[in-house]
Amino acid sequence: MQDAIVSGGSEAGIIKSGIGGFNAVQALSKRNDDPKTASRPFDLDRDGFVLGEGGGCVILEELDHAISRGAKIYAEVVGIGLSSDAYHMTAPHPDGEGAISVMNNCIRDSGLTYKDVDVVNMHGTSTPLGDKAEAKALGAVFKDHLYSMNINSTKSMTGPVSYTHLRCRRWTLCR
């Protein structure tokens, strides 16, 4: 096993085929005149997202190794969750089954309970189908505890950066 790993990537997907594909499935916001309000995950008036480009990198290190070298530790990964939602090519299962599965897997792997979670960074595409399914999944997993949590989506600030976000944001539980 390695003491530390670096994982990163970048995406520059604002090209004709990228815009055309997302436009064809009506996933793009039509609020282009006001970028600050265009992408609004979980908002009642959401209508899609604004494409983004970006890159990211994470450094993951064994806790003992990081402590021994005096590293500043930002978080400890205590659980991970993996799942797949193969319901439809462009839409999640209406009840959020894939999201429910990944969140439950992560919580189970951590040894914590759903009441130990205080912040959730969701996929949050700002699309009517996606956000509705994620909201249902949050309710199914976190029940009444949902109302004492903070919920956000990085996409509201960056737009989806396609495959890069998979490297930068996975379903993890951190302390």
Predicted features by range, described:
Residues 1, 25-50, 137-163:
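Conserved catalytic cysteine-centered active-site region
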Residues 6-10, 72-80, 115-122, 149-155:
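Beta-strand segments within the central parallel beta-sheet cores of soluble alpha/beta enzyme folds
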Residues 35-110, 118-119:
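Condensing-enzyme catalytic core mediating Claisen C-C bond formation in acyl metabolism
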Residues 10-14, 26, 55, 63-65, ...:
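Glycine-rich beta-alpha junction loops
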Residues 164-169:
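Conserved small/polar residues in nucleotide/adenosyl-binding loops
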Residues 87-96, 125-142, 161-163:
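Short glycine/threonine-rich loop-to-helix capping motif typified by GTGT followed
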